[in-house]
Amino acid sequence: MGDPSKQDILAIFKRLRSVPTNKVCFDCGAKNPSWASISYGVFLCIDCSGSHRSLGVHLSFIRSTELDSNWSWFQLRCMQVGGNSNASSFFHQHGCATKDTNAKYNSRAAQLYREKIKTLATQATRRHGTDLWLDSCAAPPVSPPPKEEDFFASHASLEVSGAMQASAQPESASSTPWGLETTPEKHEGGPGQGPSVEGLNTPGKAAPEVSSIIKKKPNQAKKGLGAKKGSLGAQKLTNTSFTEIEKQAQAVDKRKEQEDLARGAPKEESIVSSLRLAYKDLEISRKKDERLNLSGQKKVEAERLGMGFGSCRSGISHSVTSDMQTIEQESPTLAKPRRKYQEDPEDSYFSSSSKWSEQSSRYFDDPMELRSSSFSSWDDGADSYWKKDSSRDPEPAMRSTGSSDRPSARRKPEYEPIGSTDEAQKKFGNVKAISSDMYFGIQAQTDFETRARLERLSTSSSISSADLFDEQRKQTAGNYNLSNVLPNAPDMAQFKQGVRSVAGKLSVFANGVMTSIQDRYGS
């Protein structure tokens, strides 16, 4: 037995997927499944096929219905005898309604269904061999191809048939041209007897008058491609009395006029009532004016000041433009502006520096007193020494805050500019070019220390500003000592000297004490 061809495989799966239950996934219900489980004969989506593949081929053998072309006849028979509906009913009959894939296909019901599908597929393969369809899955009847219809020909035929039907229909209410009724001929008499003329004097039956001009026909169902049944849209006119229509129109106009009059009456009544109220208010206000005996300017002022006792409805209110008076201020006093800077900037600078120096001197005086009080218990001489230092004039502290702290080379030398221009002309009259140092005499006042430093650094290949101005470079944190941290002020120098003297005296005192102890207890 050979393998089925690709056309046979496509034909079989096309037939199987046409079943409504096979158009969705057996496990999750996704549409258009393209994979199949041969072991159960069900259709699956690509996600559920991965879950079945993880179970193993001994539980579920997966193939693609579109990509795989090496199907065998036994595998195709498994799909034909199976199906999503058969598998679903079998699992429900055996009480397997779980959604878990592992639990579902490892259950007893799944094992029984696998054996059933295998048995039915083997029997179908032996019975039908290589036949494309089984008895239970017969080939679908081939329907003839739809015949192409000519749109214009069908439309024309429908119109012609409709016109013929309209002409064949008898008129419902027909009458003679003159409204006479004709009676059938009576053949009971002889052949010479003519038609009866008894109905000539009888008036014809008048047709019932219809209020509408055009008679509407009931809607009829349309057939074909929009063709209308009956005539080509023509509508029949009936006998209508135009005088009756005119009477109805006049009646409608009269009704509208009456409605307009009825609407206008309440408006007029409201206007009249409002006028009555206005006249009543005017009468009340007039009586109050007579009682208060107000007239002329007094009445206007009373109403403006709110003394109308609730009757101020004449439109008079407080006005900004009326009775406005301009009040002028007599002998205005101007505020004297405060001077932001009372003194010259240089004076303020020196005054601020003097204040700071006073505060700093006060700060430096306090530690001295504290130190003197602490050391007074050790030596009376030290106490007198600190008292002597604390009573000194705080001028050194004031001088320390000035410009004397800066190096002498960086300070601007104090010089006196040349008094008159005649001296400068006499001094520099024959010189082609001069500098500011020459003009102000700065070069002549160069300090001796600066010259000495320049001579000392003349042999150096490179110098720095710290070397030129004899400034100490910044030391590392490990090289700092108490002398570098404490400010270099005269008071601090005296403080250091006092500490050294006290320390020396303390050491002498300690040596004396130790010597006396050794002499007393050592021997």
Swiss-Prot record:
- Protein topology in the membrane: Peripheral membrane protein
Mechanisms controlling activity: GAP activity stimulated by phosphatidylinositol 4,5-bisphosphate (PIP2).
Reply yes or no: does the keyword Phosphoprotein apply. Answer: yes
- Keyword tags: Cytoplasm, ER-Golgi transport, Golgi apparatus, GTPase activation, Membrane, Metal-binding, Phosphoprotein, Protein transport, Transport, Zinc, Zinc-finger
Tell where it localizes: Cytoplasm; Golgi apparatus membrane
Instruction: Write down the InterPro entries for this protein, in alphabetical order.
Output: ARFGAP/RecO, ArfGAP_dom, ArfGAP_dom_sf
Protein name, as recorded: ADP-ribosylation factor GTPase-activating protein 3
Say which species the protein is native to: Mus musculus (Mouse)
Taxonomic path: Eukaryota, Metazoa, Chordata, Craniata, Vertebrata
| Gene name of the record | Arfgap3
